């Protein structure tokens, strides 16, 4: 099967955690080309991803380098994608992000705010801009921004999200940008934001401990990844511009 007949999925941040889990699920499907961005191709977690069980017919993994704080990496990654003969993207998942600061709102400083904003909001925006020409050639293209309920302005008080002002504020900015993409590109692309659940990653476990949920977050990486893929599979034009909890499929207030 030619590349033009394959479903091409781009996932940022596949080096570990949810991104790696999502990549493995798409790679298990026939005729899926999975393009994953990583910061460092030499890490053990990336080696594990590359050593995943042999993909079915017509499926393969392509890794590209993107550092979330770089203003040039996304465009360079697109050139690397084109060099492999790939001329379209059907699904783009802006998953890469970080929670580098856990300083409360009473103490958070400018450096923490700017670092989070650059990684979690500007990075996905630059990725969207770089991938746009390839998305326009996709079949019923979809864009999903991996956000968090901590970025929901409507849930700041119920979730006590003010314990993560830099992270939550940056994700709120990502939500605004996602809504902007959904509105401006609604004629041809379905765009959503999604909350992947409180997942058993380093940041997820920290939050679980902070709010008294125990040592580990309630959602495994595998279950989160499966929920994200299921949600994206079921998207329709009517889904455009919405913010979903991937775990249960419900809408999250912006």
Curated annotation (Swiss-Prot):
The active site is at residues 167, 171. GO terms for cellular component: cytoplasm. Gene3D superfamilies: NAD(P)-binding Rossmann-like Domain. It comes from the Eukaryota. NADP(+) binds at residues 18, 37, 67, 95, 167, 171, 199, 201. Belongs to the short-chain dehydrogenases/reductases (SDR) family. It comes from Neurospora crassa (strain ATCC 24698 / 74-OR23-1A / CBS 708.71 / DSM 1257 / FGSC 987). Its EC number is 1.1.1.-. This is Short-chain dehydrogenase srdF. Keywords: NADP, Oxidoreductase.
């Amino acid at each position: 099967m030619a590349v033009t007949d394959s479903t091409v999925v781009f996932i940022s941040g596949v080096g570990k955690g949810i991104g790696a889990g999502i990549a493995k699920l798409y790679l298990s499907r026939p005729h899926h080309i999975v393009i994953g961005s990583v910061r460092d191709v030499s890490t053990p977690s990336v080696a594990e991803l590359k050593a995943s069980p042999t993909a079915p017919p017509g499926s393969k993994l392509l890794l590209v380098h993107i550092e979330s704080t770089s203003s040039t990496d996304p465009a360079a990654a697109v050139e690397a994608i084109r060099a492999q003969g790939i001329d379209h993207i059907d699904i783009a998942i802006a998953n890469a992000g970080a929670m580098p600061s856990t300083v409360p709102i009473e103490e958070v400083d400018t450096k923490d705010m700017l670092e989070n904003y650059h990684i979690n909001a500007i990075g996905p925006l630059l990725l969207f801009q770089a991938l746009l020409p390839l998305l326009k050639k996709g079949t019923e293209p979809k864009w999903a921004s991996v956000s968090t309920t901590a970025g929901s302005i409507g849930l700041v008080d119920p979730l006590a999200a003010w314990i993560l002002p830099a992270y939550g504020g940056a994700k709120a900015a990502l939500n605004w940008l996602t809504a902007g993409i959904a509105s401006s590109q609604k004629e041809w692309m379905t765009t959503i934001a999604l909350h992947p659940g409180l997942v058993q990653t380093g940041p997820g476990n920290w939050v679980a401990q902070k709010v008294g949920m125990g040592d580990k977050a309630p959602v495994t990486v595998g279950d989160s990844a499966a929920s994200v893929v299921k949600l994206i599979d079921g998207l329709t034009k009517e889904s455009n511009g919405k913010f979903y909890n991937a775990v249960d499929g419900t809408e999250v207030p912006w």
